[in-house]
Amino acid sequence: MQNRTGLVLCALSLLTGFLMICLGGFFISSSSSHSHRNLVVAYVLLPLGFVILLSGIFWGTYRQANDNKEMFNHVLRQHLAFQDLPLATVDRPDFYPPAYEESLDVEKQACSAGRGLLGFPPPLYTETSLEPQDKDKNDPQPEAPPPYPENIAVAAATVKTQDAEEPSTVLKAGAVLQLSELASC
């Protein structure tokens, strides 16, 4: 009986909080009468509704956790019983880092061994690409691009040859349409 009463009270607090929030929103949004009294009631209902709603949520959560406390304790005890036993370790002196002088000797040995393995310098690269340069080439520099006026002249010549071979159906620098283009529309 006590369980059912607590559940009903929790549901009533949630419903009351929700209704108070809805009433506060309605009073604020209703345009029929904007009296001072309605606005004061609305601004009191909104926060009060939020407080009642949140307290109902936390109350229901607490009741559910309190009802199932024995289950949580049982699961926690089982989890703690299956934990690994703590391991005893032995602290050895070689675990600590080497002295400064010893670490320098190791770096020197590693550097000299690394150079001995390679035995040849890395390949040469150009500034413009990451492709290796061929040493057989006579010209180490890539070919320079043509100057701007030359590029414009070449582009204009190719456009003229294309227009001579086949007339373009694209609209040129005017608003006049050709007769064949009008017939296709």
Swiss-Prot record:
Pfam families: TMEM252 (PF15664). The chain crosses the membrane at residues 8-28, 39-59. Keywords: Membrane, Transmembrane, Transmembrane helix. It is found in: Membrane. Residues 125-149 are annotated as: Disordered. The keyword Membrane applies. It is a multi-pass membrane protein. This is Transmembrane protein 252. It comes from Rattus norvegicus (Rat).
